[in-house]
Amino acid sequence: MKSDHKEFKLKDSVERIDQIISSRDDCFAELDGIPSRNSLTFTNGFYVKCSVLFVNIHEPAGLNDSNPQTENLKLYRACVSEAIAVMNSNEKCLEINVVENVVSGVFNTPWRENVDDVFTTAAKISSIVEIINCKFKKNCSKKATLGMGLSYGKALMVRAGYRGSSVTDVIWMGDVIKEAATLATYGNKEPTDRETMVSELFYYNLSEQNKKLLTLNSFRNCYNGDVLNSYFNNWQKLNCP
């Protein structure tokens, strides 16, 4: 959220606090899908069923130094750029956020085939990063690796921020968000961890064909796999061997 530097007034602050305290407790409806942002006020909210994808871009050595190597920064930017581009191409993706080395998306998935589409989105991101690594290998000594977490469940969607200013945003809360974020940290962490980590409920909603691409990771209590998009993968073999 970009600041707009409005004067802080204690009287107005107390009024805003009182409005939040006095807001009704029954104004949080449960929905099967994600409503428009315009439906949100500073006193209501929605419990919505959704799918969440977190992409953890494991940082190349030196990226957090005070003067990161240019090649590392370019590699990071390319991964963030294309992860966002792939998520944005999915019409069910309603929210995209970037915090440090993590790109996340919230998807409206009222039908099981929509969950499969999110799984396909993750596979495309995995494949595009393989292409990025191939493109960078002549100029960059580092290689980008990912950890991806996919989860399905209920999230709380609320508007939060400074009422009366432009410093507001939609906030997503709930176990489904935390679960996807945690699973992403497991991706490629240990030799037994694959790149794409999928929650049990997300796995349950996948097609039988997609389920076959994953195996049980009993240590992480999830399913995992190294899943690529066949079209992207074939392009890489032909154009970036």
How does the language model describe each region?
Residues 36-120:
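Catalytic NTP-binding/metal-coordinating core of nucleotidyl cyclase/transferase enzymes
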Residues 1-39, 179, 188-241:
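Intrinsically disordered, glycine/charged-rich C-terminal tails and inter-domain linkers
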Residues 3, 13, 22-23, 36-39, ...:
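Generic serine detector
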